[in-house]
A protein has these predicted regions:
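Serine-dependent carboxylesterase/thioesterase catalytic core
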Residues: 1-6, 10-11, 15, 20-21, ...
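C-terminal catalytic-base region of ester-bond hydrolases, centering on the histidine
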Residues: 134-207
Length: 207
């Protein structure tokens, strides 16, 4: 299952969907209101989709894998806190996903204090917020390191132009991969899909 990021739609994940399908996967490319409404609406939608899988005669041999890009990572984590969806998801792969807050968010919020009142999903990006997935879920993290754009000078040495390496690190990850791609391209390359395939099938990104 593909989960897009902030201010995007399922169309932004279209290339990854096509690439994974070429590699033999059955892919659900989901769409969420991740621009203006509170993220709780998206959490309810993802929860409903997972429960439909659980009670819809899911083959036990089929793995359920959630792939979250950008803010989609926080949407996954918040949804999986719900006890009703425990045990459904086998693996989570996070792509350039800020797990708590981000430098860009903090700086823009200083300049525009009403930012989170307009773009309500951004409220989940807080310096002291937690990010924790169930220990039974295998987690892989992919982080871009090809810097570009006007914000890159704020972000430190390793960044993809939108988020930096530290913002995406998850201590509970089984594997973390850095690849030299920018934020807006990292999820669209066949190479990224092949790394995802490796992690799903072998538990490591590079083989």
């Amino acid at each position: 299952m593909l989960i897009h990021g902030f201010n995007k739609s399922y169309r932004d994940m279209g290339a990854l969907q096509e690439n994974l399908e070429l590699l033999g996967y059955r892919v659900e490319n989901l769409n969420f209101p991740l621009t203006f409404p509170d993220i709780k609406f998206s959490e309810s939608m993802l929860k409903e989709f997972l429960l439909d899988l659980k009670y819809g005669g899911l083959n036990e041999k089929e793995e359920i894998i959630l792939i979250g890009y950008g803010l989609g990572g926080k949407l996954i984590e918040r949804t999986l806190r719900d006890e009703e969806v425990k045990g459904i998801v086998d693996k989570v792969i996070l792509i350039s996903a800020p797990l708590r807050d981000s430098v860009i968010h903090r700086r823009l919020k200083r300049a525009f204090p009403i930012l989170d009142n307009i773009f309500k999903p951004l409220r989940v990006l807080k310096k002291n917020s937690t990010f924790k997935l169930d220990d039974n879920i295998e987690v892989g993290v992919i982080i871009g390191t090809e810097t570009c754009g006007i914000f890159s000078r704020w972000l430190g040495e390793f960044n993809d132009g939108i988020v930096n390496y530290k913002e995406c690190l998850y201590e509970g990850a089984k594997e973390t991969l850095k690849i030299p791609l920018v934020h807006n391209e990292i999820h669209k390359k066949m190479g990224t899909a092949k790394y995802i395939n490796n992690f799903i099938s072998k538990g490591v990104f590079r083989t």
